[in-house]
Amino acid sequence: MMSRCGIVSAGNMLVDHVHQIAHWPQPGWLVEIEHSQRATGGAPLNVLLTLARMETGLPLAALGLIGCDADGDYILQMLAQYQVDSGRVRRSETAMTSMSQVMTEPGGQRTFFHAPGANRLLDLGDFDALHSNHKIFHLGYLLLLDSLDCPDEEFGTRSARLLAQMQQRGYQTSLDLVSRQGDPRYRPLVLPALRWLDYLVINELEAGEFTGLTLRTANGSLQQSLMAQAAEQLLQAGVRRRVVIHCPEGAYGLESGGEARWQPSWQMREAEIVGSVGAGDAFCAGVLYASHEDWPLVETLQLAHACARFNLLCANAIDGARPLPELQDFIRRQPPAG
């Protein structure tokens, strides 16, 4: 049997219109936009274009639904520029390309105004022809894919059915969520998918919503002692290989064999942070590449943190991505983390 190689990523495809503002205004007041730029966004594009800019040589492919409009043209141009296979990206004649207006404040804090557009229509039938030789299938974001978030009598949700199909076709599977505080759908939509997952990479807010654990207190302090408990819950719920929970302070990884690790983030000054759009996807790209290459957990988390760190140096989701040798050189030059 031919060995599998590469990553195919599917789900929310959109264009981020990123605006730099000096501060968030009070209701009824005006604040000037100091700088604007357009960039691709959403889990598949952020992960794939980060991996492409890492220059790893892995075959990369995208699957999604976009509109017949300028934003859709831009997405296809970006995929072509970075030599990502776009043959499975379909265009809708009835729905616009999804887009977000992103307001970024000094220090990197951002607020999203999102129009789902064509992503709402992505459904199981769009995956019928996916029988590629890629090793990993990455889906994102659950809770923002209306058709795939619908109930399924046998699997619980249509996204769970999709992930089961992908595993049955020989892919290792990975899933990303969206951060939605207080969304009552977290457990009913996420739980059915976990048993069909090899990798789950989420942030502490998403992990807290699913597990019910308060990983960050009301004053913003991280409850690091509960990160292990949350990861264990997610692994026990069905994830087969790795659970990684990341946050600005660091990341906790847990493997099915029992290996666990807390890895602090690489230190940055606040003045260095330009934006955090796509930082979680950059982190995820690092985890997926390292997992594809069967790297140990410690090295996996270090690479993921390096990907996220360089992401923070730019306003959009991909411009901060660096070639893999540069990331590895950065890691080697860092003092040992506690």
Residue ranges and their predicted role:
Residues M1-V15, D73-R91, A95, V102-W262, ...:
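Ribokinase/PfkB-type carbohydrate-kinase core domain
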Residues L51, N203, G280:
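Short, conserved phosphate/pyrophosphate- and ester-handling motifs at nucleotide-, phospho-/glycolipid
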Residues A237-R242, W266-A337:
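Conserved post-catalytic alpha-helical subdomain immediately downstream of the catalytic base
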Residues A43-V47, M96-S98, C284:
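Short glycine/serine/threonine-rich phosphate/pyrophosphate-binding segments
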Residues R38-L45, D69, E153-G156, Q224, ...:
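Electropositive phosphate-/nucleotide-binding environments in soluble metabolic enzymes
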Residues M1-V84, E272-S276, A337-G338:
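Glycine-rich phosphate/adenosyl-contacting loop at the front of the ribokinase-like
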Residues L49-G57, T104-E105, A290-E293:
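Alpha-helix C-terminal capping segments
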